[in-house]
Amino acid sequence: MKLKVTKLEKAAILPKYVHSDDSGLDLSAIEDLEIPPGESQLVPTGIAIELPPNTEAQIRPRSGLALKHQITVLNTPGTVDEGYRGEIGVILINHGKNSFKVTRGMKIAQMVIAPVIRVEVEEVDHLSDTTRGSGGFGSTGLTSD
């Protein structure tokens, strides 16, 4: 399966897997910018992609940035639809207490290519019963007892 990538800027870095068994391709910033504490920024990557049929790209945080700097992807996972052909941008948010400097070439997120199942929506008067029912938002408790 091929992911077609166009560099929109000469200095853009192609997404790549670091290890042969990685799930996500690293995405890199194309410019320097600073994210103050509590704020978010759209970080450009300088690339556009053409996804294989019936797939999406999920933009996810990098665990090292989250743990060491409290930087994460704001709308995680960000969804890139199959038909989108514009620049891939990553919305990073700084949950830390210090400003964070994004530098050109820095790995800022990872992109996972995933299959998409499209469904036909059917309106019904009633849904089937289950043991869970409408219980949600913590209804199963916090412990594994």
Curated annotation (Swiss-Prot):
| Keywords assigned | Hydrolase, Magnesium, Metal-binding, Nucleotide metabolism
Which SUPFAM superfamilies does the UniProt record give? dUTPase-like
How would you classify this enzyme at the top EC level? hydrolase
Which GO BP terms apply? dUMP biosynthetic process; dUTP catabolic process
Q: Does the keyword Metal-binding apply?
A: yes
Please give the pathway this protein is involved in: Pyrimidine metabolism; dUMP biosynthesis; dUMP from dCTP (dUTP route): step 2/2
Annotated substrate binding lies at 62-64, 75, 79-81
Source domain of life: Bacteria
| Reactions that this protein is recorded to catalyse | dUTP + H2O = dUMP + diphosphate + H(+)
Enzyme Commission number, as recorded = 3.6.1.23
Name the family.
Belongs to the dUTPase family.
Protein name listed in UniProt: Deoxyuridine 5'-triphosphate nucleotidohydrolase
Organism for this UniProt entry: Gloeothece citriformis (strain PCC 7424)
